[in-house]
């Protein structure tokens, strides 16, 4: 059993898992942190940094030479300076949390000898140059950009390397498989090599026009003969000597070559002349092997069997030099006759039998127009740069730069490793460009595939997809910025006087900084962090997206990419993915998975040696795993770790097969390694249908943090891990003793790793009522008392949605599964009034409103209490500066910040001028632009922040806020100082006590003993004056004093820095003089229309809140809190919720029994804990933690368990049906889990027993208050004059085409006309309606809707002139004569 933490002892979970976990789960946000640390490498290690991350970027761009080569700019090293503001300050001020990057550059100027061209160094200058700010990652793996927290999502993309594939027979009508190979570099040109329907091999560069692959080989420097000898074996056919039958050719016999050979004539042994195989038969593999065993060396072939073979070499007349036949030529009867006449005794032929080896490269060579390297290079040049006339030099350079130039082409280490593995090469992974051998090996492998040897690659295999995490994405982005900068530097180096210039003058860091800013601000992968609750944060950081730059697009991604692949096991969660268009493209990392240095996802396994499972854990990537047999984690083992079954089911190369135990190589570490964090939080996941489990994992991320969080009775054991790793709950950084505590901070006096250079005090600031990105409330509260002793890693404060250090997204409520008057029809949820009254599902949401006072061209705007035409009543909650008080209750329409804006002088009539002169009326030239509470919001002001531009006088309110902040900082400083004094003077007293004193403060008698009483006579600051004859002791005291002074100075300095930052003006956007942010806390009780869900995808909307007395109740009078429809279970197949209900019921029953034992203990005079211990032992069995508890800890535990005993049932290894029955029995309940339930309105029992129990319900972030919306008048669209749409724009509801049909069907003509005119876009009519209503009269006439005018304008723009003739309806009626 794991050693429980401080909070873990206060509430112990009963654990149902049977499988011992050997591997520690990696930190859940490691993906983000490790990747970015590797990129930044903030601290330079001994011996300099490795070539990776930022260092590699600088190394790849520098040195930069000018065009003439007379000077060179070299990169020496880089370092980061301290960030200007810390994370919290950045969040408040809307800044980016970043550190300035300082790069040391060296400029070398050369003297070039004009005759010899030799270079000699003339001058070297080194200088530190500022290269922009680089955003830093916070402790929790996020970035603060412009004041908001963002996450950079990792991207899944196709790994660089070579891929072989075919078109599945779709391209050509015959359904023939056309094979293709593609070499994908990390950056650079793509190379495709493909077959066409005629079996000719072509190459394409960057998806351009295709060229024969032989042209590519010519360009690589091969000639025709070399190409043939590379791809085909050569066989020498010798002329057989006459005798033993007719003439023929002697052919060496090779069983592999001749298998499947169909004979035209008899096959004859060349040595004996015997017939080996009669004509017209096929040589089987077995027969071919038997012939070899019988000693067959060679066969005799007749002339006609040579026809159709191809020559391997040029046949040249040695005397005249005349070429009879070229390599690759096909032998015809005519050419064979000619060769026989010339008397050739030996013919070198290509080993092409059209069965095992096809003539594809030979045919391509024959079809290729280009015959020389030059022609081929020109051809490639024309394809890549059409329209430019090629020269040999430019063509050579262009081809060289395509694949062989490290500046433009980079396979990356991954690409090289993958290429070596696929093609069986052994180039070192530092060799990042292509080589001739690589290209030839690719063509060879492709041809082999066409010949039926080998397998094509599966692109969805995780060995062929890799993850680009933050560090790598950032590295690519920064490289782009530096390359933009490089061009500018080169030009500048050539244009300035290089002798007088310093590196600083050559560098403009803007492009690099802009690239970084653009990436964090607007990249598709830089996302606004989902901060609804701690789980949603963690999931967001562990997300893998196939979208984004260089990835897929939603529209083009097919079914295969989105589907679950066998290699996902233990690496990517098969359950958690969004519903909708992104399904399968956005995935989540599995719980135990990690990303290796090459970007492949790895998962841990236990090693199996000789059929025995060891505790050694090995991480394997998908490529490596395919070679082994891997067993499941839940297989039964005996005490020695051997498999108990004779056949073990294993996964091997994507298949599942039974093997004997000695063949097993690895075993899973844990059953939950296959799912993601969110899915691992669902108890009884194994009993839910996958579609519902997907909804369950997605909906847990939308759970709103409640005012009173409560950990689930039925958990999975993952709750503590999530709370700790997400950073929601605060863990102690060092062991120590709690020194001070209040609602906003915890002060710990450290008792371990007391580094003299570090402070001995840890102060943890708690976040109080802060707004999250999703407007939920972040609030932390301490869990410890003064004097508590905590160890490193113990939870000392709970955050949002955490309870005693465990994730608590919802509440345990008493559920009855039964219909109730149709109020739970179609997934509706019926709630008891108790839930509202006791604030069970109440949450706090914090809305932020801001207002800016700008400097306009008519004069500055002003934030003030003095607003024209506003009653004193409306100003009641504003202070003298015009800003709302903290604690004021506000509702829609109330003023939060008073602001007036100057408006332009409108021309005045002489009368007005006279009045203005007499009464001095000046207020009319400003208008009221105050910040008001938007509709639908009401709450309490919890915080106000005022930002002033540098040099603008601060108002009273700003000064008051500043004073408060400085007081808080001073208190922190004083507390830390006090603890420091106590520690130091305590140690000093221990050192001096009982020593001989040879000197001391004024009034101390020399050579007397220093005792505690003597010390207490003097103020502590004078203790340093005591001296003792022991030199070693004095040295120690001196060192201690030095250390103390430094700590004191450091403390004061930190305080002064922070105060200086506070008093300094704020950096505001241009033209803004002052900015005020107001935070309103809104308390949301649950109400009909809110969405709720369980953890099993069982979601619904609250339909009615019923008085407690009307709810169904149990025999003991307990009323149900929530009634769910039983019909929601069978069709959806999420039975997990029923099992959870039963187990929750047992938990509550056991909690009641423990509660009774605690009460008995408190009531008894002797205070005997034995009965309580017995009860706990019955529940928990043999639990180490419970045994180790003191009496008072036992009682506290008992109190905490009163509502219910929390249990953990891990996924795929949880409680079985028998366990649940046993728990119910232990709690003294019916094993069926059903109870007699009475109707709350009549008091009669229902006919059948009802399933009743505790279920964990969440309130989701889809609240009716945010969605409900109504409008009478409001803004209109400019062109169409129709009301805008949507709640955010205060828009109207669209009365669309189908709604019009409905009114037409009713025949409601007047209502319909109103809808389409005066209620929408008839501008004149709208005003008339208003006037009519004001007059109290209800007749109005509809005019021409604006949309008609828009139509007329559109027709005119098409050149159709439409004239409108206005006339009365009567005039338009046909006359009676015309009618007749």
From Swiss-Prot:
SUPFAM superfamilies per the UniProt record, alphabetical: beta and beta-prime subunits of DNA dependent RNA-polymerase
CDD domains from the UniProt entry: RNA_pol_B_RPB2
Family (UniProt): Belongs to the RNA polymerase beta chain family.
GO BP: DNA-templated transcription
PROSITE patterns: RNA_POL_BETA (PS01166)
Name listed for the protein in its UniProt record: DNA-directed RNA polymerase subunit beta
Keyword rRNA processing assigned: no
Subunit field text: The RNAP catalytic core consists of 2 alpha, 1 beta, 1 beta' and 1 omega subunit. When a sigma factor is associated with the core the holoenzyme is formed, which can initiate transcription.
Gene: rpoB
Keywords: DNA-directed RNA polymerase, Nucleotidyltransferase, Transcription, Transferase
Entry EC number(s): 2.7.7.6
Role of this protein: DNA-dependent RNA polymerase catalyzes the transcription of DNA into RNA using the four ribonucleoside triphosphates as substrates.
Swiss-Prot/TrEMBL catalytic activity: RNA(n) + a ribonucleoside 5'-triphosphate = RNA(n+1) + diphosphate
PANTHER family, per database record: DNA-DIRECTED RNA POLYMERASE I SUBUNIT 2
Pfam families: RNA_pol_Rpb2_1, RNA_pol_Rpb2_2, RNA_pol_Rpb2_3, RNA_pol_Rpb2_45, RNA_pol_Rpb2_6, RNA_pol_Rpb2_7
């Amino acid at each position: 059993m794991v050693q429980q933490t401080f909070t873990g002892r206060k509430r112990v979970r009963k654990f149902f898992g049977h499988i011992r976990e050997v591997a520690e789960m990696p930190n859940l946000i490691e993906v983000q942190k490790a990747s970015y640390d590797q990129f930044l490498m903030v601290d330079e290690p001994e011996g300099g940094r490795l070539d990776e991350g930022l260092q590699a970027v600088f190394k790849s761009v520098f040195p930069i030479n000018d065009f003439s080569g007379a000077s060179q700019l070299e990169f020496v090293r880089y370092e980061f300076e301290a960030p200007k503001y810390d994370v919290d300050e950045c969040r408040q001020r809307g800044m980016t949390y970043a550190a300035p990057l300082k790069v040391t550059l060296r400029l070398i100027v050369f003297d070039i000898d004009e005759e010899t061209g030799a270079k000699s160094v003339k001058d070297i200058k080194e200088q530190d140059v500022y290269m922009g700010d680089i955003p830093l990652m916070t402790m929790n793996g996020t970035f603060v950009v412009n004041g908001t927290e963002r996450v950079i999502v990792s991207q899944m993309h196709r790994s660089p390397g070579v891929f072989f594939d075919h078109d599945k027979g779709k391209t050509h009508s015959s359904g023939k498989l056309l094979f293709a190979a593609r070499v994908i570099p990390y950056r650079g040109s793509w190379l495709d090599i493909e077959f066409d329907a005629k079996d000719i091999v072509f190459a394409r560069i960057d998806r351009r026009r295709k060229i024969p692959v032989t042209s590519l080989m010519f360009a690589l420097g091969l000639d025709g003969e070399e190409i043939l000898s590379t791809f085909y074996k050569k066989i020498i056919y010798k002329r057989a000597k006459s005798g033993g039958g007719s003439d023929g050719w002697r052919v060496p016999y090779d069983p592999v070559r001749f298998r499947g050979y169909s004979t035209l004539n008899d096959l004859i042994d060349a040595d004996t002349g015997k017939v080996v195989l009669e004509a017209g038969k096929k040589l089987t593999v077995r027969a071919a092997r038997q012939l070899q065993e019988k000693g067959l060396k060679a066969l005799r072939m007749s002339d006609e069997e040579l026809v159709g073979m191809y020559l391997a070499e040029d046949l040249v007349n040695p005397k005249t030099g005349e070429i009879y036949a070229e390599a690759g030529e096909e032998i015809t009867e005519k050419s064979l006759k000619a060769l026989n006449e010339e008397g050739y005794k030996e013919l070198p032929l290509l080993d092409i039998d059209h069965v095992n080896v096809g003539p594809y490269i030979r045919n391509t060579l024959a079809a290729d127009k280009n015959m020389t390297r030059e022609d081929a290079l020109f051809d490639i040049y024309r394809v890549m740069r059409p329209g430019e006339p090629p020269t040999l030099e430019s063509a050579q350079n262009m081809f060289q730069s395509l694949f062989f130039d490290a500046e433009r082409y980079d396979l990356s280490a991954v690409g090289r490793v993958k290429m070596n593995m696929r093609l069986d090469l052994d180039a070192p992974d530092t060799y990042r460009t292509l080589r001739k051998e690589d290209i030839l090996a690719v063509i060879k492998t492709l041809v082999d595939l066409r010949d039926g040897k080998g397998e094509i690659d599966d692109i969805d295999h995780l060995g062929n997809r890799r993850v680009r995490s933050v560090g790598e994405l950032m590295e690519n982005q920064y490289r782009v910025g530096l390359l933009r900068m490089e061009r500018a530097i080169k030009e500048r180096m050539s244009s300035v006087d290089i002798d007088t210039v310093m590196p600083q003058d050559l560098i403009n860091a803007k492009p690099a900084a802009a690239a970084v800013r653009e990436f964090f601000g607007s990249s598709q992968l830089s996302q606004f962090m989902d901060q609804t609750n701690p789980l949603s944060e963690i999931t967001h950081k562990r997300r893998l997206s196939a979208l984004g730059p260089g990835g897929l697009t939603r529209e083009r991604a097919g079914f295969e990419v989105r589907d679950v692949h066998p290699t996902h096991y233990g690496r990517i969660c098969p359950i958690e993915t969004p519903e909708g268009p992104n399904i399968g493209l956005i995935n989540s990392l599995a719980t135990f998975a990690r990303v290796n240095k090459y970007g492949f996802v790895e998962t841990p396994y236990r090693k199996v040696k000789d059929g025995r499972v060891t505790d050694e854990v090995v991480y394997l990537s998908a490529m490596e795993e395919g070679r082994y047999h891997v067993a499941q984690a839940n297989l039964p083992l005996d005490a020695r770790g051997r498999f108990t079954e004779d056949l073990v089911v294993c996964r091997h190369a994507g298949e599942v097969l039974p093997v004997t135990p000695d063949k097993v190589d690895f075993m899973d570490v844990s059953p939950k390694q296959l799912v993601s964090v969110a899915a691992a939080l669902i108890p009884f996941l194994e009993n839910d249908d996958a579609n519902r489990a997907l909804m369950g994992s997605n909906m847990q991320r939308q759970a709103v943090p409640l005012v009173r969080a409560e950990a689930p009775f039925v958990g999975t054991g993952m709750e503590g891990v999530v709370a700790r790793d997400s950073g929601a709950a605060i863990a102690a950084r060092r062991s120590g003793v709690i020194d001070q505590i209040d609602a906003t901070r915890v002060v710990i006096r450290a008792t371990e790793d007391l580094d003299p250079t570090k402070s001995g005090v840890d102060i943890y600031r708690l976040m109080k009522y802060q707004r999250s990105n999703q407007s939920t409330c972040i609030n932390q509260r301490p869990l410890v008392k003064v004097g508590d002793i905590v160890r490193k890693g113990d939870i000392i404060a709970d955050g949002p949605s955490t309870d005693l250090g465990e994730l608590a997204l919802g509440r345990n409520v008493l559920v009855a599964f039964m219909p109730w008057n149709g109020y739970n029809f179609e997934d509706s949820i019926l709630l008891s009034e108790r839930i509202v009254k006791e604030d069970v599902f109440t949450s706090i949401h914090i809305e932020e409103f801001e207002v800016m006072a700008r400097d306009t061209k008519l004069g500055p705007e002003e934030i003030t209490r003095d607003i024209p035409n506003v009653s004193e009543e409306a100003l009641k909650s504003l202070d003298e500066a015009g800003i709302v008080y903290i604690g004021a209750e506000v509702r829609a329409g109330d003023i939060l910040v008073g602001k007036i804006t100057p408006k332009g002088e409108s021309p005045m009539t002489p009368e007005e001028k006279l009045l203005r002169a007499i009464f001095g009326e000046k207020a009319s030239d400003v208008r009221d632009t105050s910040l008001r509470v938007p509709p639908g919001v009401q709450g309490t002001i919890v915080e106000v922040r005022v930002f002033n531009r540098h040099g603008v006088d601060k108002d009273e309110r700003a000064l008051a806020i500043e004073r408060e902040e400085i007081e808080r900082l001073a208190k922190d400083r004083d507390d830390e100082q006090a603890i420091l004094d106590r520690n130091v003077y305590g140690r000093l007293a221990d050192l001096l006590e009982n020593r001989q004193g040879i000197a001391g403060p004024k009034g101390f008698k020399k050579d007397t003993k220093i005792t505690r009483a003597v010390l207490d006579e003097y103020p502590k600051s004078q203790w340093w004056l005591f001296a003792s004859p022991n030199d070693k002791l004095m040295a120690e005291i001196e060192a201690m004093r030095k250390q103390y002074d430094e700590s004191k100075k450091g403390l004061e300095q930190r305080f002064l820095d922070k105060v200086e930052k506070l008093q300094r003006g704020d950096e505001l956007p241009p033209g803004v003089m002052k900015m005020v942010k107001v935070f309103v806390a809104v308390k949301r009780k649950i109400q009909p229309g809110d969405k709720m869900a369980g953890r099993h995808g069982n979601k619904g909307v609250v339909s009615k809140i019923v008085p407690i007395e009307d709810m169904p109740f149990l025999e003991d009078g307990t009323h149900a809190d929530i009634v769910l429809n039983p019909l929601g279970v069978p069709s959806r197949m999420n039975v997990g919720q029923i099992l959870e209900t039963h187990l929750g019921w047992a938990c509550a029953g056991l909690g009641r029994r423990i509660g009774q034992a605690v009460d008995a203990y408190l009531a008894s005079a002797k205070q005997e804990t034995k009965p309580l211990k017995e009860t706990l032992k019955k529940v928990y069995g043999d639990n180490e933690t419970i045994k180790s508890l003191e009496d008072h800890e036992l009682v506290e535990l008992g109190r905490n368990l009163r509502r219910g005993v929390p249990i953990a049932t891990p996924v795929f290894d949880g409680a079985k049906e028998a366990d649940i029955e046993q728990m119910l029995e232990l709690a003294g309940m019916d094993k069926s889990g059903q109870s007699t339930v009475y109707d709350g309105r009549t008091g009669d029992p229902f006919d059948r027993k009802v399933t009743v129990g505790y279920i964990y319900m969440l309130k989701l972030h889809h609240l009716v208050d945010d969605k409900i919306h109504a409008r009478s008048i409001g803004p209109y669209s400019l062109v169409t004059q129709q009301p805008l749409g949507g709640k955010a724009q205060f828009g109207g509801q669209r009365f669309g085409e189908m709604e019009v049909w409905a009114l037409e069907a009713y025949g409601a003509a007047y209502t319909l006309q109103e809808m389409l005119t005066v209620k929408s876009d008839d501008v004149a009519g709208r005003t008339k309606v208003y006037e009519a209503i004001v007059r109290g009269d209800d007749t109005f006439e509809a005019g021409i809707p604006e949309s008609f005018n828009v139509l007329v304008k559109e027709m005119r723009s098409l050149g159709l002139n439409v004239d409108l003739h206005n006339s009365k309806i009567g005039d338009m009626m046909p006359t009676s004569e015309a009618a007749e």
